[in-house]
């Protein structure tokens, strides 16, 4: 699709890559043709190929989830649901794991690659339940995965006693937090990400200085502050 857009003569492309390495040849082709490449939500492996990158502070998103978990539980066995071909996922997992490792009472007992998709997260969670894996915490790199995990746990009568954390601040996840089913989510601000990306494109068009990389802040949503957020949309 990127090659097609470039061949059609577009002058700029906003990209949220599913695989931050496999995207490189298409990006290199675009740069050869003079196309501005703006990355949103997640990064490219070689950041020098991007004209601009606008992302959430993904490492801090993982840190916030881990810190909140540590404030709520004295110990735990953790399953991580990740998407290792995206930089955003890797940063979230790294932030979470780095923070958890500071406490010797928590153990990561499994890491599942669910490609960031609910329909993959749910059967993976079911497989772990069937295997009898001992865990009481699940950290998912996005709320879609967390929702798949919770659906599987509900089907197996295991929702009680399992702490589920995610990243996004999606409306469905906020509803689950309000109902005390989900523990917490690190909220992203997609409107702010999009606005920053468009602003930088205008800077490119008008010859003004462009910020090479912008990190948008994230905030934890939990039972303590859920009433400050709407469950009917994004923040």
Report each predicted region and the residues it spans.
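Short beta-strand elements in bilobed, periplasmic/extracellular small-molecule ligand-binding domains
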Residues: 77-82, 97-119
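Hydrophobic alpha-helical
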Residues: 2-7, 12-31, 96, 110, ...
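Loop/turn elements at helix/coil->beta-strand transitions in domains of secreted/extracellular proteins
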Residues: 8-12, 32-37, 50, 74-77, ...
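Hydrophobic alpha-helical segments within soluble ligand-binding/sensing domains
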Residues: 54-78, 90-91, 118-125, 170-173, ...
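Hinge/cleft segment of the Venus flytrap/periplasmic-binding protein
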Residues: 99-100, 189-235
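Flexible loop/hinge segments that line or gate small-molecule binding clefts
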Residues: 20-60, 77, 86, 168-183, ...
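Secondary-structure junction motif
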Residues: 81-82, 86-94
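Short secondary-structure boundary segments
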Residues: 17-18, 42, 82, 142, ...
């Amino acid at each position: 699709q990127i090659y097609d857009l470039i061949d059609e003569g577009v002058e700029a492309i906003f990209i949220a890559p599913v695989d931050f390495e496999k995207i490189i040849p298409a990006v290199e082709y675009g740069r050869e043709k003079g196309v501005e490449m703006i990355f949103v939500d997640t990064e490219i492996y070689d950041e020098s190929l991007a004209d601009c990158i606008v992302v959430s502070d993904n490492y801090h998103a993982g840190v916030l989830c881990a810190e909140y978990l540590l404030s709520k539980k004295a110990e735990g066995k953790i399953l991580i649901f990740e998407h290792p071909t995206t930089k955003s996922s890797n940063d979230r997992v790294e932030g979470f794991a780095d923070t958890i490792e500071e406490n010797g009472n928590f153990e990561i007992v499994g890491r599942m690659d669910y490609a960031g998709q609910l329909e993959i997260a749910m059967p993976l969670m079911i497989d772990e339940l069937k295997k009898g894996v001992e865990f009481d915490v699940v950290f998912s790199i996005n709320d879609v995965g967390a929702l798949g995990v919770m659906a599987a746990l509900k089907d197996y009568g295991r929702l009680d006693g399992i702490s589920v954390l995610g990243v996004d601040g999606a409306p469905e996840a906020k509803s689950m937090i309000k109902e005390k089913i989900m523990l917490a989510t690190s909220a992203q601000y997609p409107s702010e990400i999009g606005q920053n990306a468009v602003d930088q494109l205008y800077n490119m068009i008008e010859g003004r200085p462009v910020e090479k990389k912008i990190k948008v802040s994230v905030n934890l949503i939990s039972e303590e502050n859920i009433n400050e957020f709407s469950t009917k949309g994004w923040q």
